[in-house]
Amino acid sequence: MSDATRARIIAIANQKGGVGKTTTAINLGAALALEGQRTLILDLDPQGNASTGLGVDARNRDLTTYDLILEDTPLAEIIRKTSVENLWIAPATTDLSSADIEMVANENRVFMLKDSLANRATKDFDIVLIDCPPSLNLLTINAMVAADAVLVPLQSEFFALEGLSQLMLTIREVRQTANPALRIEGVVLTMYDQRNNLSRQVEDDARETLGDLVYATRIPRNVRLSEAPSYSIPVLEYDPASSGSQAYMNLAREMLDRHLATA
Ligand code: ADP
Ligand code: MG
C-alpha cells in the first residue's frame, strides 16, 4: 500500500438484497487475505450475515460495529480474528438496526463511520471491505463517505441494471457533498450462469453501459458458495477447488492487478 498509515477502504454496496454482497465480502476478503493482504471485513448489516458466516457466534458479540459508530469504542476492541490467516471481522448484531435512527439526530451523521476509522485506526490493515445493508440508508451512506471506493455486486438477473442507476446517483451525490474522492472500484457479475441467456444479456448490457468498470472475472452460481456459511468458513476453506473459490481468487487478483496498474 502506498499509504502505510491506513487501509484502502472499499464499500460493497447494492441496495438490492440477495445480490451477493455478503458472499463477496466473505470470499473476496478471504481471497485477498490468501494473497497476503491484511484484510478486515466490517459488517455494517444489522442481519450480521458476514459475522455469522465467519464464525462469530451471535451470543458472543459483545462489542460490534454499533459500538464503533455510536459509542466511540476503538476499532481494535471490536475486531476478531477469523479461521483464515490475515483475515479479521468487525461483527454486527441487530443493535445496528436502530443505529440509523440514532444517527439522524447527530449533525455529523454522514461522517460518523469515517470519524470512527480516523486516527490511524485501520493502520494494521491493507484493505477494509465494508459489507453494506440492502438499502441506501444512512449506514450505507456512512460506508460511502468513509470509503475510497465502492464495489458493486451485480446479480446476473433481470432488472439488475435498473437498481444500478439509483446506486450510481447516490454515489454521485456522496461525491458532490461528503466525499469528492469516492471512486467506483468495479462492478462484479454474481450468480452468473453461462448457459442462461439472461445472464449473458445482463453481462452484455453491463459491459456496454459500464465498460471497463465491469471486472473480467464473473462469479458463477455455485452451490458451494451458499453452503460454506453454515460451516462458518469461507468457501476457500470449505472447498478450495470449487468454481466459487476459483472465481473469488481470480477476482482478488484482478483487483490487485488493477490497483497496482493505477497506483
Ligand atoms: P446480499 O448480501 O447482497 O443480500 P448474499 O451474499 O447474502 O446477498 O447472497 C444471497 C443468497 O445467495 C445467499 O443465500 C447466498 O449464499 C447465495 N449466493 C450468493 N452468491 C452466490 C453464488 N455465486 N452462487 C450460489 N449462491 C450464491
Ligand atoms: Mg448481505
What is each PLM-predicted segment?
Residues 1-263:
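P-loop NTP-binding core
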